[in-house]
């Protein structure tokens, strides 16, 4: 009788361990996808905005790219045109990603952008949606950094 109980307890413990491990797998896989998406967007952003490597940056886009920035057309060519115009107008443009968040297929960046080295710059929130590891949609909002503020917290 004791052997049967011990065997039953061992079997129950093994089943509980297997169930816990199986339950952790999807969450771990989701974390992996989120982290991979974040790495993709950060690599894209560095290629596009800091190194001005438009061809390398374009490789991060999916086959259909939806742009919500009113200054840019949809598609890789719309992005390419916008970036070329920005770099021509602001050759000293520099972007410093302060925070990066991933939630499912979305990656959000909080960025300090300086169009000219001597200026205070802009606080920008960039939102990207990815499918199968490729950027397929983009939104952004911009706010100039003021000379003075009502608080001492800073924009970043």
For the regions a protein language model found, what residue spans apply to each?
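C-terminal and inter-domain tail/linker signature
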Residues: 2-156
